[in-house]
Amino acid sequence: MAKTVVSPDTIALPRTSESEQLKKIRHTTSHVMAMAVQKLFPKAQVTIGPWTETGFYYDFDVAEPFTEADLKAIKKEMVKIINKKLPVIREEISREEAKQRIESIQEPYKLEILDSIHEPITVYHLGDQWWDLCAGPHLESTADINPKAIALESVAGAYWRGDANKAQLQRIYGTAWETPEQLAEYQRRKEEALKRDHRKLGKELGLFIFADPVGPGLPLWTPKGTIIRTILEDFLKQEQIKRGYLPVVTPHIARVDLFKQSGHWQKYQEDMFPMMAESPEEAAQEMGFVLKPMNCPFHIQIYKSELRSYRDLPLRLAEFGTVYRYEQSGELGGLTRVRGFTVDDSHLFVTPDQLDEEFLSVVDLILTVFKSLQLKNFKARLSFRDPESDKYIGSDEAWEKAQGAIRRAVQELEMDYFEAPGEAAFYGPKLDFIFQDALEREWQLGTVQVDYNLPERFDLEYIAADGSRQRPVMIHRAPFGSLERLIGILIEEYAGDFPLWLAPIQVRLLAVSDEFLPFAQSIVQQMQSLGLRAEVDTSGDRLGKMIRNAEKQKIPVMAVIGAKEVEANALNIRTRASGELGEIPVTEVLEKLQATVTNHDTW
């Protein structure tokens, strides 16, 4: 499998979670920032200030929101503190001593934090000038922070404890690195990420919208965006047909009882939309309907609708099913975090003996999908059980068999993988695909889950060869994960430049004058009859402007038509991938376009 290649002119950036030194730098820098804020704004009250994967933040209770000018002043004060080379001192104190100190400086948020933490109670001091409750880790001195490798980035509102009913605070985000070069590379990537932001490109390319009357987290797909969705769905459906999957369709709502039996109501109720009941009595007895958060209980009902034999298995049911999660409004973000999304869901019902082969087939399908989407830099996370824990259901033998099937699949396919003991769900191990994009950000795409729980909860059975009734094993799988999230990631990965087979408009014909429009229209008709998505620019603009407009819309292929092309029955081709290709006969263009689309190639 392909590995991530970092070009010589870029700098590899360490991750906070993988670098103890970077964790200390960011944690200590957050304390330096809090000290600077309280020096400049004496009435500011501090709350929490952790490190993050890209930096750090601190939440403050202040009378007025911070401004850009405030951030500059805070940064300047931070540099002064760093240059004082203050020692960072860890102190362990009693809960009563901590309470007395906090009360003496009148910091109510710290008192609330104190009530929620376990002993030992630790305090970190910056010299003898500032302190905060903290578990660490930290640097030994502010001198260990490079003032040229830190930056304050933005301010946002945040509720205390994430509760909208509590005080609204001001959160300052910052970043800190080991060297100025790392900071510069991070800022370069961040700027590039803004250019690739799927929310920005989605609007510019006319792919999807959000509308206030509809509500947050509920995207509306335009014709162009719908084309991309449809192509992705059709592609996966064809791959599934080759592998013996059977299509099903299930409703968007169901009785609460279904999700009580599956366990979703007990475990995920806070993430589900409120129940719909026809009467107060139904509401009181929880007898109403809910929007489905998952598709699996529906597929189980289809399995249970008739007696199954071992000869019927494996049974592979597949659906592009829309599910609903009541995400908090502050957690929503473009297409990657929404309230209604479509999952390429499939549930395989297999005998224990079929688990290896079926799991391998599912992984092979996901690799086929990734190859077609040109997603090369990924690794597999094997989420296994912790052998010391007793939270898991199922026998040791069943778990070893399932984990062995996952391990053998990734090894046979020569995948880059790592094992994560203790990360399995209580009902079975799973395989997650972690994709690294062009900016070296990680996303989870595609998952395969072995499940012993739901067959037990729903009492699923099949008649074995010896006539006995046996329990099948379920495999949940979703190569895309969710269509919305996948498309958001693809927009950013491609920077809006979709490959020819996925592009909403594949070819735009540009006639240098209106007299050549009939010829252009005839070519479009030929292309459309072959299933190609083509259109004519009828704006009447000059050729240069038509080319610029097509480039802005990231049309993969432009075909210029003038007198010479009409006479030769040819097209002057320009592609985004290869530039100007010159005059090519129409028949050759059509053949090349068809072959490129069929092979998911570039031209």
From Swiss-Prot:
Catalytic activity: tRNA(Thr) + L-threonine + ATP = L-threonyl-tRNA(Thr) + AMP + diphosphate + H(+)
One GO process term, biological-process aspect: threonyl-tRNA aminoacylation
Localization: Cytoplasm
UniProt cross-references to Pfam families, sorted A to Z: HGTP_anticodon, tRNA-synt_2b, tRNA_SAD
EC number of the protein: 6.1.1.3
Domain of life: Bacteria
Top EC class for this record: ligase
Annotated spans, Catalytic: 197-499
Sequence similarity: Belongs to the class-II aminoacyl-tRNA synthetase family.
Subunit record text: Homodimer.
Protein name (record): Threonine--tRNA ligase
Organism: Synechocystis sp. (strain ATCC 27184 / PCC 6803 / Kazusa)
